[in-house]
């Protein structure tokens, strides 16, 4: 895996690595709760706006920045349910957009059967941090799985 990501990815100074399944679940929770409060339907979250918010929280400011967004997802999940664009292969992987913060390029990687999700995520995070070009890393990941008490 490490060689695959090293060969496939053009490293940017700024990298966002996100557990796509987790952010999709968080978006679902927010949408459901706010729909109840305001009494109307809320559309899926805009991926570009979400990425902008993460970048701003991570210290990126307006300018000609390059940001690599890496989405890690379950291999059985082809798309997120609560974001647009949502399909990992068709809409996100290899795509990019440019706005006032810079250019955001997307890569998505499914977690295959032979590896645990947490191990895969850590391997990719270690690979990112080992790249000399990378100066800023923003990580979005559920650190502990929910227990019965959390549900």
Please describe what each predicted stretch is:
Residues 2-108:
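Domain-level signal for Mg2+-assisted phosphodiester chemistry and nucleotide/NA-binding surfaces
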Residues 97-151:
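Nuclease catalytic cores that cleave nucleic-acid phosphodiester bonds
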């Amino acid at each position: 895996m490490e060689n695959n990501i090293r060969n496939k990815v053009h490293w940017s100074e700024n990298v966002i690595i996100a557990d796509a399944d987790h952010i999709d679940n968080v978006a679902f929770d927010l949408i459901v709760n706010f729909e109840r409060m305001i009494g109307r339907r809320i559309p899926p979250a805009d991926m570009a706006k979400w990425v902008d918010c993460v970048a701003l929280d991570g210290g990126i400011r307006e300018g000609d920045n390059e940001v690599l967004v890496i989405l890690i997802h379950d291999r059985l999940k082809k798309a997120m349910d609560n974001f647009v664009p949502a399909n990992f292969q068709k809409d996100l992987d290899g795509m990019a957009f440019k706005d006032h913060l810079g250019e955001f390029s997307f890569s998505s990687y499914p977690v295959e059967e032979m590896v645990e999700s947490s191990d895969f995520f850590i391997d990719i995070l270690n690979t990112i941090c080992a790249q000399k070009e990378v100066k800023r890393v923003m990580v979005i990941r559920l650190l502990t799985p929910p227990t019965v008490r959390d549900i």
